[in-house]
């Protein structure tokens, strides 16, 4: 065919595609006008579809690498989008956060958009807990694309599995109905495990990618430009992701995956996003780069500048692990977390963790102190130790309250090759008076020699009661248990009962200690229970619930 005729043929094909798109838009608007109701999953994007979470919306190679411009420049050199269209990002010109991957082939570019439309439909049906039918899929992408449906569905399935960890499965062979199933172990090991429910966590990896490609900090305008490409707009509730501003500035910030802060020297004030500490802890720049590369059907080396940065990040992490605190086998890890919740006033909290490793003998101590002169406090401290030998753990929580309600919780968990576990919890709630509660659990394991100690002290200024319970077990294959209860009451009558049961059979031992306090005038109850069982497999738990109908006090 002569060159001129080829050009005319290409022009006719391009005009036909544009006419098809325009016809789809008119059909969708006509249907919406006739029905007069909110669109469903099958017609919401029939004509005015956005890219959703297709590859067209994800960050791609940066301008600095000699590729097509995709990521927004940090300041004045940013690419700008055409604002002529009011229908959404679909009709915008090429921008820094979006470049049509098949711009040289209108047919492939159209299939990419259809993939995004089908993805949004499938996610919508998943959220509604309804199966997706092949007939509705054809309505979404237009029946003209019936022959291309298998290819479009395959691409949409790959993207959904990559981003959300959801697999598209046919309910019955050749049945024409599909559903999304969560994959507990996605083939891509890049996904983050968050406490956020689906689908909020689906945006996390792409957002971290945008921040990474923008010099490890992205302005709020750049983030919204990227989200707009996905059909997510500020102030508009998204059918899949809900309220987007709350998601990125509150939920992901609260989970410590993102940092949302004011840009330095900005006037008027503007804000930016950075990786949060949890993002640095749970993923790496290389994993994010691998994610972006897979989305764009390329390799991490296609981002040379960022690939070099990701390699440096890997080296720095390896050096930090080698020089820092021990982390494997006989080397131990300790983590202390303190969480304070305050809606109206100021708190003070201090958490300390000490690790000593000498011949695989480990010690860890966590302390939390709360001081509140006038309001309500919450504090939580958690310490976890793990290796392969002997462990000791102590957790102490002192509470001081001058006038109001306090809550403190301390939890210690030990795990090693002898399968030892020790757990201590302290909860204190005071509605009318000053209380103090202390619980200690110490566990030492050396060739089936075990010791467990539980101690509870209660102090009530109105009734002046004290109760102590102590249980000690020791010596290989021979066990002794002692329980002591001491009551001191200057103003009211108290009753105390202590029971100890021992069962010994081939190193399988159980010891139980119960302490009950009954005060007719104050109505207090305290119970302590310690259980040990199975040879070389030990568990010790100490629980002390206290109920005071006058003071409403509980201590465990």
From Swiss-Prot:
Residues 334-554 are annotated as: 15 X 15 AA approximate tandem repeats. It comes from the Eukaryota. Residues 111-310 form the MAGE domain. SMART domains: MAGE, MAGE_N. It holds the Pfam family MAGE_N. The modification Phosphoserine is found at residue 325. Expressed in testis (at protein level). The keyword Hydrolase does not apply. GO terms for cellular component: cytoplasm. Residues 39-73 have a biased composition (Polar residues). Residues 1-110, 315-335 are annotated as: Disordered. InterPro entries: MAGE, MAGE_N, MAGE_WH1, MAGE_WH2, MHD_dom. It is found in: Cytoplasm. Residues 1-15, 77-87 have a biased composition (Basic residues). Keywords: Cytoplasm, Phosphoprotein, Repeat, Tumor antigen. Sequence repeats lie at residues 334-348, 349-363, 364-378, 379-392, 393-407, 408-421, 422-436, 437-451, 452-466, 467-480, 481-495, 496-510, 511-525, 526-539, 540-554. PROSITE patterns: MAGE. This is Melanoma-associated antigen B4. It comes from Mus musculus (Mouse).
